[in-house]
Amino acid sequence: MLRRVNFYSICIAFGLSVLLILAGSRYADNTYRPSMESGRNVRTFLKVEDGEENFVAPIPSNSYDSVPSVEKIIEKTRSKIKFELSKYNFSDSGAHELEELLMESGGQPIQSLIISTWRSGTTFLGEVLNAIPGTFYHYEPLLKHGIVQIRGPPESTKALRTIKSMLKCNFVGMSDYFEYGMTHFHQFSHNTRLWDHCKFNKELCYDYDFTSRFCKLFPFQTMKVVRVRLRLVQDLLDDKELNLKVLLLIRDPRGVMQSRQHRTFCQPSADCWQSELLCADMISDYVAAGRLLSAYPNRVMVLRYEELALDPNATTHRILKFLRLSATQSLDEFLKLHTNVEVAGVSSTFRVSRDVPFKWKNVLDFNYVDEIQTVCKDAMSLWGYRMAHNATHMKSAEFIPLDNYTITE
């Protein structure tokens, strides 16, 4: 009997020891990576694209006995960026050293702005650029505007002011932005390098002074916006304080509308649910692209989502060349991981890319497709998307929706 008691006592003691070791390793300063925060965790990328459905992960509370000071975070981040980019090829950017691209050193970062609309592949493209070390990712700064397209004043004035301020790392006076983020955490969580410090102190994400200082540490900035049309960005391109390039991402309206069917946020909004408004914006963007490509050579790029999905590696390197960025190992790993596996979730960026762009052919009813094509005929012709003639033609393997296109002024 005594031996049995001793045996059970030893088992219990051993079990408690294992639990303590595991707990200690999980919360050690240099290893703590909660599953919903890890930048490389699969679930990180199963996010609501634009946050119209609440992101389920709250900002984590501090699990440490003490909170790192702002100065410690700034210094640690500065050192980390230097280490991660110690072998980076800056020659593509025209810079000789890292400091030339840092605002805190008086330099100009390389800045990119992705312009598109809902469900057009911006989440994937944004994550591609965010995979490059030293990138500060401004995710959807206009979330607070709701499910609307901003096509002109007065909303465009406020929207462009917000975009300019963020690209200049000046978050002063942006109380609306921070207040929205207090209840919509995805506004911050996509910016993985900022979010990584919110787990220590959630107030950091709402601190304009910290966010401004933190932003100025980074040599690369990328921003994605799905609520502003291309013709409005001329004001940004004219701003001499910015080192900005603009990338317009277009997608087949049939694929866009098929993808939007899965989003409950979309249906109440005419801007999101009416294909005629989507295609009117596509025509507007086509006209603006012709004008801006002529006026700002080498600063505007046009890309169809299907090209990125069908050949992500080659297309990504075209984008990098346009942005004057160099490929990195982390970017190559991201592309390999995110384009060769399928993970469930309508906002997942883990997809077998070649299967995504033409999914609409097999899941949409032809009558609905025909309705889209009727109101989108001109937009589809301009952007090089072929028409489906009937249900049999639409579903056939021989029907390739992509055609050539040319942008003219």
Model-predicted regions and their roles:
Residues 9, 195, 200-202, 209-351, ...:
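PAPS-dependent sulfotransferase catalytic domain
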Residues 1-112, 118, 185, 194-195, ...:
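PAPS-dependent sulfotransferases, especially Golgi type II membrane carbohydrate sulfotransferases
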Residues 121-122, 319:
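Conserved G/P- and acidic residue-centered "switch" motifs that form tight phosphate/ATP-binding loops
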Residues 111-113, 134, 243-247:
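Beta-sheet entry/capping signal
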